[in-house]
Amino acid sequence: MRLYDTARRAVVPFEPGPLVTMYTCGITPYDATHFGHAATYLTYDVLQRRLRDRGHETRCVRNITDVDDDLLRKARELGVHYLDLAAGEIARFDDDMEALELLPSWSEPRATSAIADIRGFIGMVLDRGHAYESGGSVYF
């Protein structure tokens, strides 16, 4: 199998071990997903199925950004709690992926489950002088 390596900007042989792990950015669940989303997940699905056909175990992680400016804005517009909006859109997304018969993700970590870690990381980069605060936000 050969894959395009963006770091090398070339198609290179891909010779994985028995377990192949993958990560793909998931949705920010504030509105219906579209075909562009499906195309991404279809690509990962085809790759996983090919690897499985070749005898590899695959684990694909796809995050869910369940707290975000767009999600908070849309929830305010609709007069609902942002987590309720997210839950409904995630359910619609899952239904769409199932209708396309795509493999489910091995894990779907949510941004809200990592808030403490994110705050710790931000504190660390600020303490080390690798970030700065401006207008209530931190940049690095």
Question: How would you name each of these model-derived features?
Answer:
Residues M1-F140:
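NTP-dependent nucleotidyl-transfer catalytic core
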